[in-house]
Amino acid sequence: MISLIVAASTNNAIGKNNQLLWHLPNDLRYFKNTTWGMPVIMGRKTFEALNKPLPGRINIVITRQADWEAAGVTVVSNLETALEKAKATNCREIFVIGGGEIYKQAFERADKLYVTRVHATIGGDTFFPAIHEDKWRLVSNEDFAADEKHAYAYSFQTWERK
């Protein structure tokens, strides 16, 4: 199963200048728990923003830079090869974790979307594709209010392809 996991504002912004637009500790914990032990596929810019491989996961980085390498990751040149490497692990689920270009490439291949919907309109330069309800079914939604650790209200949503 191919899944995309993302935190996106109501206008689908996910980042600006290769940085997240918010700090939501519960979302970071949710991301870790959901992806733990699974292969994660990301673009080079996303990896560079993380600055190191995600522990407890098989990290696969897509880049067009032929000579690029980093310790602790598998480097590939395209999404198809990344998916092949991830499938070879025999894990039950493969996670695409960003960034914007990789999400666009993987969106039509995805079976499931894990979306942390940040309930705010925030300016960004990187966006997640729109989720159309004629193609996707919302199967779970859990709402959380803003609090002292979370500047924005947010929801954990799970969508499955119809």
What kind of region is each of these model predictions?
Residues 1-162:
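Enzymes that bind and transform nitrogen-containing heteroaromatic metabolites
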